[in-house]
A protein has these predicted regions:
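Structured catalytic-domain cores with a bias toward divalent-metal coordination
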Residues: 1-214
Length: 214
């Protein structure tokens, strides 16, 4: 199957301009399980975007071979508002310059409207309950009237993610700890050499300056 793309246009806050969010879908629309992945809601945290960039061709190939059982939605660059915020040569993508809000705060709370829709209908079938609650959450989001660009972004992303079985919101930091990944057998089987396997792994980690061994 071909990759499916969707473009969400945000309301313009400046005459003559507008921003968009690109959404990529793999697998069968509406199929389960549904996985939603977004990156760079803090817009200067770009490793998540890079991770999804490298994931895309693998998903495209898997989709062509019919290997994706459910639906996978990627939003590699979820925050075009923050992407545009440059101060001199510095990228300031964590807070919205207009409202001073952290981009990853103040998501839309639909718990009350959902509760009002479903509390008399909850039954003993867990799967039916989940389906009903997801439907009510989407209805509540569709009833929202966002007042500005940032609110629109939040509502639209929650529409994509609120009924997902798995949600991955990719972040990073300005510092990355160096990890050493080793196979289980390399760690527990031995001895190999004077240190044994565990000792050899620890010695290698020390030589490399590794901070975490997995």
């Amino acid at each position: 199957m071909a990759i499916k793309t969707k473009t969400i246009q945000l309301p313009s806050m400046t005459p003559g301009t507008h921003r968009t969010v690109s959404v990529l879908s793999f697998g069968k629309s509406g199929a389960r399980p549904k996985v939603y992945m977004q990156a760079a809601i803090h817009a200067n945290e770009m490793p998540g975007t890079m991770a999804l960039h490298h994931l895309m061709p693998m998903l495209t190939e898997a989709d062509k071979k019919g290997l994706i059982q459910g639906e996978i939605i990627l939003v590699p660059t979820v925050n075009p508002i923050g992407q545009s915020q440059l101060v001199g040569n510095s990228h300031a993508g964590r807070y919205n310059h207009l409202s001073n809000e952290n981009f990853n705060r103040n998501w839309i709370d639909v718990s009350e409207p959902v509760a009002q829709k479903v509390w008399k209908k909850i039954g003993t079938n867990p799967e039916a309950n989940v389906k009903m609650i997801r439907k009510a959450a989407l209805e509540a989001l569709n009833e929202m009237k966002p007042a500005n660009e940032l609110q629109t972004l939040r509502v639209e992303m929650q529409k994509l993610s609120t009924d997902a079985d798995y949600v991955l919101d990719l972040h990073c930091d300005i510092y990355a700890a160096l990890h050493l990944f080793t196979a289980h057998n390399d760690w527990v089987k031995g001895p190999t050499g004077p240190l044994g396997n565990e000792g050899a792994v620890k010695a290698l980690a020390a030589d490399l300056g590794v901070e975490a061994t997995m």
